[in-house]
């Protein structure tokens, strides 16, 4: 069995490990209430299915979108951020649309990282925060975030005490 050097560098995928534990517990007869990854357990509402069907049948949607995403969607995203968080984001230079957070973060990691760059990632965080940079060849340092110190203080201390200085620091909302 061939192993690839970038894959070998990855830590175990926490969601796969948790899924395996749930499967073992269920096989042993345990009644599991799953608070894991958000896989839908209800059908998609009919009005959403109808709108999707309508869009799929429209020949204008049978093409690739612009590489940064549909302009109207980018404007709607920036308006949301302005209304929700009070920030001014430019839809032309500060907003892109991706298929999801994993794709976006993996592409960002590859775009801004050179092999050997130091990247600081808070722990806990979403697995792609580490995985994307590891695949890009970076040296990732996991920074434990303790409730008594707080996320920003932990990252600030880590930056101050890092040699070499990090190329990037992942700043995420701790509960995603």
Where on the chain are the PLM-derived regions?
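Short glycine-rich anion-binding loops that position phosphate/pyrophosphate groups of nucleotides
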Residues: 40, 102, 126, 173-176
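Active-site phosphate-binding strand-loop segment of PLP-dependent enzymes
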Residues: 141, 146-176
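A short helix-loop-beta submotif of the ANL/AMP-binding
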Residues: 135-140
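Conserved beta-strand elements of the Class I
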Residues: 96, 118-120, 141
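A general structural motif
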Residues: 32, 92, 116, 164-166
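Conserved PLP-anchoring active-site segment centered on the Schiff-base-forming lysine
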Residues: 111-127, 132-133
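N-terminal small-domain helix-loop-helix segment of the aminotransferase-like
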Residues: 3-4, 8-99, 107
């Amino acid at each position: 069995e061939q192993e690839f050097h970038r894959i070998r560098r990855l830590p175990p995928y926490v969601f796969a490990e948790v899924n395996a534990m749930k499967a073992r517990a269920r096989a042993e007869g345990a009644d599991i209430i799953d608070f894991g990854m958000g896989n839908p357990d209800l059908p998609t509402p009919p009005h959403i299915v109808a709108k999707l069907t309508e869009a799929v049948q429209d020949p204008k949607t049978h093409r690739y979108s612009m590489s940064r995403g549909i302009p109207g969607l980018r404007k709607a995203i920036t308006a949301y951020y302005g209304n929700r968080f009070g920030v001014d984001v430019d839809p032309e230079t500060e907003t892109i649309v991706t298929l999801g957070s994993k794709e976006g973060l993996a592409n960002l990691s590859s775009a801004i990282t050179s092999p050997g760059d130091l990247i600081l990632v808070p722990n806990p965080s979403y697995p792609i925060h580490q995985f994307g940079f590891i695949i890009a060849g970076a040296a990732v340092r996991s920074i434990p975030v303790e409730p008594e110190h707080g996320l920003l203080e932990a990252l600030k201390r880590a930056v101050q005490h890092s040699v070499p200085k990090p190329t990037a620091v992942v700043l995420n909302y701790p509960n995603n």
